[in-house]
Amino acid sequence: MLTRVKSAVANFMGGIMAGSSGSEHGGSGCGGSDLPLRFPYGRPEFLGLSQDEVECSADHIARPILILKETRRLPWATGYAEVINAGKSTHNEDQASCEVLTVKKKAGTITSTPNRNSKRRSSLPNGEGLQLKENSESEGISCHYWSLFDGHAGSGAAVVASRLLQHHITQQLQDIVEILKNSAILPPTCLGEEPESTPAHGRTLTRAASLRGGVGAPGSPSTPPTRFFTEKKIPHECLVIGALESAFKEMDLQIERERSAYNISGGCTALIVVCLLGKLYVANAGDSRAIIIRNGEIIPMSSEFTPETERQRLQYLAFMQPHLLGNEFTHLEFPRRVQRKELGKKMLYRDFNMTGWAYKTIEDDDLKFPLIYGEGKKARVMATIGVTRGLGDHDLKVHDSNIYIKPFLSSAPEVRVYDLSRYEHGADDVLILATDGLWDVLSNEEVAEAITQFLPNCDPDDPHRYTLAAQDLVMRARGVLKDRGWRISNDRLGSGDDISVYVIPLIHGNKLS
């Protein structure tokens, strides 16, 4: 086992293995290169690239930065820019999509409806009508959707998620569209159980209504059943959060099902934003990042999910289900690898229940390879993968073994909410979404400084200002090719990863509040 692990570490310490038609980090499974692709590889459709342009963009030496040709292809004059990696993988494994979704309930019911009853307006090919907040159909709710997917071990999962996750979100929102439209009424505990006119601030009847046997009066058909216990009051935004969480789960399950019929390689992180009824919902599963820059202030809108940040969850799972470790790993963490000569000595360690450190007597089991190994960007789960949440990776195994890693990975996103109506946003207030290729080399503060220096020097009425700002961020992170590789400011090493960046102006949210 030690030889296998050393081989795995050698393969992965520089980053997750990337191969456009590779074998899931050495794992084998239902998906294979002999199967057809679920969707063909390409760059985001809103870029409007020809096939020749897509091929030219895959230049690992020149690394040209791609930007929007037409700003009207994206809502809110959103800016977007991307660049391919410096040779880590054949293709740019980042994917992005942006659309305006219209969610419409099935006539006569508020129960779950098939996807055919939702309408989805694509931002392609010309993006006309993207600025509309509501369409003419009173039953529908319109929302904006932005997404970034950072693929690893191939682009298959990222491509599929970029095409289908928005459909799952629309389908989940169908169940609650009528509830969301009436913010004055609390969501019912059971659909159809409580009268639609029940106010959010209370469910009491006047004496006159009770005597008349009106709706909600004792004995009336619409009277809720008598309860002798309290019920939680669930706010509307929690329903949207639940819908997004469910959509991520369904997307992951679909990838799992379809990998037997299609070649869906690898996995991907997922970072999405949904603007619905005046609120931004930012859902993140992985190590991409979102921040709001408002009047120079930095507001983090996501957390990164890595072996280090999720150490206790991973250790607890391994403690409860030790068979997942294949008798090859230990769930305990030590400051370094334990050596056989240290048996019987006391060494610092951490378990799932600990944020601090303590000493324990070293036993034979402690000689096994640690579940989490490495620090910072080099930390890996089972010496294999550096992110702990995302989509796909169903066939991922520890190198040269039969130990699956998927049980330790989660598709559940963290969702944060930003109420646009609470602030009057200016032209320089933006939401930044970017894959880890940007954040690996630039801090939140450096990104904010770049934005606050760049945007004020642009014409506020220039629709390209946010695209140029996104291009500037990508350029700062990529750097300039020199004798010693790509270099950024202060001669630091630039990002050799794929980089994708949205710059979303929040001033357009003022119209929604």
Swiss-Prot record:
UniProt-recorded Gene Ontology molecular function terms: identical protein binding; phosphoprotein phosphatase activity; protein serine/threonine phosphatase activity
Catalytic activity entry: O-phospho-L-seryl-[protein] + H2O = L-seryl-[protein] + phosphate; O-phospho-L-threonyl-[protein] + H2O = L-threonyl-[protein] + phosphate
Keyword Ubl conjugation included in the entry's annotation: no
Pfam families: PP2C
CDD domains linked to this entry: PP2Cc (cd00143)
UniProt modified residues of type Phosphoserine: 7, 123, 210, 220, 421
Residues with PTM Omega-N-methylarginine: 212
Annotated segments matching region Disordered: 109-133
Key words, A-Z: Cytoplasm, Hydrolase, Methylation, Nucleus, Phosphoprotein, Protein phosphatase
Segments crossing the lipid bilayer: none
GO CC terms, sorted: cytoplasm; glutamatergic synapse; nucleoplasm; nucleus; synapse
Enzyme Commission designation: 3.1.3.16
Domain PPM-type phosphatase: 77-506
Location of Phosphothreonine modifications: 113, 223
Gene3D superfamilies linked to this entry: PPM-type phosphatase domain
Subcellular location, record wording: Nucleus; Cytoplasm
Residue pairs linked by disulfide bridges in the UniProt entry: none
Main location per the UniProt record: nucleus
Source taxon at top rank: Eukaryota
Similarity comment text for this entry: Belongs to the PP2C family.
Function according to Swiss-Prot or TrEMBL: Dephosphorylates CDKN1B at 'Thr-187', thus removing a signal for proteasomal degradation.
Protein name: Protein phosphatase 1H
Species whose genome carries this gene: Mus musculus (Mouse)
